[in-house]
Amino acid sequence: MLSNPLHRFSGYHAMPSNTLMSNGHMSQGHLHNNGLDGLGQSSHYALQQLQQHVGVHNPHLARAAPHMKHHRQHPYGPAVRTAGIAGPIRRRISRACDQCNQLRTKCDGNHPCAHCIEFGLGCEYIRERKKRGKASRKDLAQQAAAQAATTGSSSGQKSPTHSANTTKKDDQKVDGGSSTGNAPNSEQHSPDDKDLDNDAMQRSQRMGSMDSLDEMDHQGHISGHHHQQAALDREHHTMSNPSALDPNSYGGVHNGYERQGGMGTATSHIMGGAAHGGYGSQGGMSSYPELPYLQTQSPTGYSGGGASYRIGTSPLSAYPLSGETASPGWGLPIPSPPASHGQYHSQHMQQQSSASYGAGTSGGLASGHPQHLRYPVLDPLVPHLGNIIPLSLACDLIDLYFASSSSAQVHPMSPYVLGFVLRKRSFLHPSKPRLCQPALLASILWVAAQTSDAPFLTSVPSARGKICQKLLELTVSLLKPLIHTPSGDVSPVSSPVIDGAALGGLGVAMPGSISMEALSGETGAFGAAGTLDDVVTYIHLATVVSASEYKGASLRWWNAAWSLARELKLGRELPQNAPSAMSDTAGNERNDNDDTTEALGGGPNVITDEEREERRRIWWLVYIVDRHLALCYNRPLFLLDIECDGLLQPLDDTAYQNGEFRPHQVVTDPDMLGEDRRSSQKSETALIRGPSFECTGHGIFGYFLPLMTILGEIVDLNHARNHPRFGINFRSHSEWDEQTSEIARHLELYEQSLRRFEQQHLSAAAQAQAQAADAAKAAAAAQAQAHAQAQAQQTSSDDSAISADNISVTDVGTPSALSVHSVAHSAHTTSSSRLTESDVQTRIVLAYGTHVMNVLHILLTGKWDPINLLDDNDLWISSQGFITATGHAVDAAEAIGSILEFDPGLEFMPFFFGIYLLQGSFLLLLIADKLQSEASPSVVKACETIIRAHEACVVTLNTEYQRNFSKVMRSALAQVRGRVPEDLGEQHQRRRELLALYRWTGDGTGLAL
């Protein structure tokens, strides 16, 4: 099985980022590697690229005096240059390499230096040469002259040769620190540019401090962008669009991705507060009004300074996303990459490609791609990605997102990927990939970066937190939550008025953008500006927040996903000749990736079977999460069964990934057909529509979706019983019993389907082994009961020993030695038979399905709230329902034993499993609390199994409620074994206080603290 995918990463331990910007003094072959990004990129990803562009010759090293390059033994000392006069040998180096300068380590001045060779780093000398002290007016005048010369050459006033020579001379003057300047050109320099240059030169005095590097992330780049602008002009003088070189715009973005390509006047600016003054003036990140719906407050005891970099409209602004407790690192300034640098980076990549991005190209797939862009699907995101991560790492993160943890079945490896709704083969197609919104691509990278082991994310402890923070900011800025307006549309301020209200900036589709199909109610959404990609992006954001300690904040994102899915009418099947949303959104030719899709997809601009399946899978995924969170947070259902009553169930994951789509559904009336045609159509249409109650596959849509359908019925029943006016006393008991019996029948149908699933997918050898394992468990249970009776007869002291098998119990807080011995014997039996991977996956599905099914039985007949369960004011413990629920609790604990045998880390469904483990344990806690030493051996063993499972959950998905309940269960198990502490009353009070945090009463919020 996989190692722990979640808790081993301590993401979001943020510290000031080190982003050194390169300037015009670098050669045009160099890449923009700076700060931490340069460390990871050059050490693992871009070393080959750097060697290709940098080469052996380094112009920066060549600028040193000839007699100096042989005397670079000592790394320290004043940087004094001689003027060609022979002098004493200087035991120092004139300049350290970029890596040693960044890491503050000793450098020998060679290329490559010894330090970089030892640690496998890319040795470079491409950073700007700076002088101490404030920049002189003459230097500023030289910069102004160079800028004026660049402007003149780009406007055609000078020939290319003359322009290049002038620029070269200006570069030499500036680099050499010449004191001569041109006064008229200095006067033409604008005051704003002078202020920026002065400010940047003042900040350059603080290069000795790592914190000052963050402050120079923006201004330092602006101060040196003039020479780089000249180099770009010479390389891209044939481009017809002048705005492509505007540092405040993304002129090179393709029109096909106009909605998300350029961050123009309508693009939202999610960063709020005075901390973003350095970026507020950039035209590429204009703001939109903040919505209170998405704002949040900092948790108690968590302070963020006024200069903190926040996401004003994200629920993650004050919350860490890892399983750790709140980290003060989130209050530190985390600069965002300047918009201009993303443009320079993309243009530099375009320069290396054989075909550049055309400013007027519709769609980016027809144009050339960067040489190392392995997956062209990332093309729309390249202009926005900037210097956050290398493109090679982005491709690796895409691979991780679609990685499967099993060779026999398709199962997501990342714990934050709940199920595959996108088809990998279509997504990663080398020539015609699926057309995606940049926000979706950024969210995929963000999700994969949470658990990636890439050196770029692990070389420095704070690297993962900073990279994930930047990817999160990029995702939300591209998504524009609740807005979803294309960037090329008019701004919300100047949008047309509809019935006296300006609605264009609130995510409402404007007149003329609604198709007739949407008006008829068959396809599309009336008044919705979002797309399928936006729903998936919301799912990614909400999933990561739900896995953190701040689960309540995830409801904001889930509500947005559910609402948009309903607006897009994903719960309905589309007509046969419905238009394709892909062609409408991208303005490019239809994306037919393989012969199968083309054969089943119909004519041009008609929705394909793959798009239909995407719609189904997205709907059923949000349907699953809606039912799951209704139990977690004690909330009513959002999505109704009637909304998807005619929607087909998703395909099997393996069939979907292989492109084995269903045949088209015949819409002819069966009464109009002959008998043979009617029987043929019946066989084709024998597909499951609407919610189902039977297990059909190994994936989340096969075994877990039916359980969530039944859970939705239980949630509705529970809220109806607890209604303040129309509750338990408003209807007769017979009506409640009939509804309960119907839900129990659905659970029986699921249990029968599990048996058929076992016979269908489990090999004969595995079935025989399963029967032998069941017999061994029965024998072990009988042996445990005999040992317990012998122990009760022999002694009543706290330190008594179990004589059988010479095994002693040494710790009441751990599982009994007998149970551990039996489990070890079972594991040995399992390993000796060498189950195939397919059999292991089937056994895992059977174990998880059996456990959740038994928990649903408990929820149907028992109580949800732990305090009400312990108080037992209505004497439910003496009813038949309690006896029935107790049997299911023991069966659920036995299923957990099977789960721990085949999935020791509980990594198969860590996002969903915790709440069912908790609700299935409340009843065992009640028995242990009430009966104590009189509890049966099966109950004691079940409590031990529950403790082991919670310990595994804490390692895999470290959440507070699991740690708290593990303490409560340990205390109760100690009392069952006769260990009564002196402060028994205080322990009971602490136990009650911990359980009181999670209430499922009328106004309780469950796990959402």
Swiss-Prot record:
Residues 141-157, 340-359 have a biased composition (Low complexity). GO terms for biological process: DNA-templated transcription. It comes from Pyricularia oryzae (strain 70-15 / ATCC MYA-4617 / FGSC 8958) (Rice blast fungus). SUPFAM superfamilies: Zn2/Cys6 DNA-binding domain (SSF57701). PROSITE patterns: ZN2_CY6_FUNGAL_2. GO terms for cellular component: nucleus. InterPro entries: Transcription_factor_dom_fun, XlnR/Xlr1, Zn2-C6_fun-type_DNA-bd_sf, Zn2Cys6_DnaBD. The keyword Ribonucleoprotein does not apply. It holds the Pfam family Fungal_trans. Residues 577-586 have a biased composition (Polar residues). GO terms for molecular function: DNA binding; DNA-binding transcription factor activity, RNA polymerase II-specific; zinc ion binding. This is Xylanolytic transcriptional activator xlnR homolog. PANTHER family: XYLANOLYTIC TRANSCRIPTIONAL ACTIVATOR XLNR-RELATED. The lineage of its organism: Eukaryota, Fungi, Dikarya, Ascomycota, Pezizomycotina. Its main location: nucleus.
